[in-house]
Amino acid sequence: MPGDRRALLEAFIRSDASPDGKWWLDVPVGLSIGDPDTYATVDAVCLTSRDPELPEEFPDHDGVPYVYREVDPEIGLDKADGFRALRGTDTFDGESVVVVAAESGASSVGAVGDLLAHQKLLEADWDWTVEERVLVSDTDSDHVTHVCRELSVRAVRVA
């Protein structure tokens, strides 16, 4: 994830505008569909039915690291492998979640479409109820604001 987008996500997660819950960044979605090596990635997911917990990648994360591991070429496992393994358990069945996309600068209408597509892929993988979709950016756009309003996506501006 590019640095600007990562900083934007972190600012949102740490703000009062974000939901409370367990956060994951760069969540692979579509793992249950087609080629196992082909998947999309949603910027962030907050499991709102869980106690508040920062993303595993954050240095001040104090929970269980379920899926994030430093890259280790000898082991050959990546984050998608971690999520695949986690899907095989019932640890996170029936969760309520918020799906988040972030785009630095002015968001594009395409980012809204990507967010909706990522939601459908996530729902195919997990037995989760998506409570809300959020598009985070640092610049307003009248077109994106209109599309978000029409499609029930919350547009959040983070400075």
Predicted segment positions?
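Charged, terminal alpha-helix-loop-beta segments
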Residues: 1-159
